[in-house]
Amino acid sequence: MILVNVHAGNCDNTLKNFKKKLQRELYFRKMKEQRYYETPSAKRVRKVQEAARRQRKFARKKMFDE
């Protein structure tokens, strides 16, 4: 359960903090993944593709840092 404190009736900052906490908990990603049933084979393929994407991103970042 996500709790957010409201200070002095400031709803804008409270909403901003709430959205930030949801993103940290990966709530939106979980909702997107659970929207439709994904077969185990499709899940494996997706995870391999995500790992490859992360590796490319890390390699690009490392290349520009040097």
Swiss-Prot record:
**One GO term of the cellular component aspect?**
ribosome
Entry keywords, A to Z: Ribonucleoprotein, Ribosomal protein
Keyword Translocase among UniProt keywords: no
Q: Which InterPro entries match?
A: Ribosomal_bS21, Ribosomal_bS21_sf
Family under the similarity heading: Belongs to the bacterial ribosomal protein bS21 family.
| NCBIfam families membership | S21p (TIGR00030)
Under what name is this protein listed?
Answer: Small ribosomal subunit protein bS21
Q: Which gene encodes it?
A: rpsU
